[in-house]
Amino acid sequence: MPSHAKTRMVALVGPLTGERRAVQTANHPMNPDDMLPVPDIVLLVAEDDASAMVFRYTAHGEFGGDTLHASVDEAREETEAEYDDALLAWEDVPDEVRDAHAFAVRYAYERLKNRDEY
């Protein structure tokens, strides 16, 4: 059985109320039509506290980008600053889950699939 990362957390991203904050490393400034999709969920993964990755996905599995951070705390702080009040509470990915990326997409889909009905 493969070992799991020490830290695996997800947080849903609600509707953005302000201007979208994005940092592009190439072709800046980028045409908004060419930007990656706005995510419905973020996944934070870290093997140790030396570095952490944040991955962004839509509820339909579209990749919305990723960022490398120096630590879990920095990843959380920068992600919370990026999405402000739109970022909901962080929740741990259950230990028994093997694929945290698939879990994140499924988690978002199950919680957001009926949002247009409200």
Where are the predicted features?
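Intrinsically disordered, low-complexity boundary segments flanking structured domains
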Residues: 1, 55, 76-78
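Negatively charged, low-complexity tracts enriched in Asp/Glu with abundant Ser/Thr
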Residues: 1-35, 115
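Intrinsic-disorder/low-complexity peptide segments enriched for small residues
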Residues: 10, 14, 41-42, 110
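Short, surface-exposed beta-strand/loop "edge" segments at domain boundaries and coil↔beta transitions
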Residues: 18-21, 61-65
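Short aromatic-glycine-(Arg/Gly/Cys) micro-motifs in beta-strand/loop hairpins
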Residues: 36-64
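Mixed-charge, Lys/Arg-enriched low-complexity segments
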Residues: 64-118
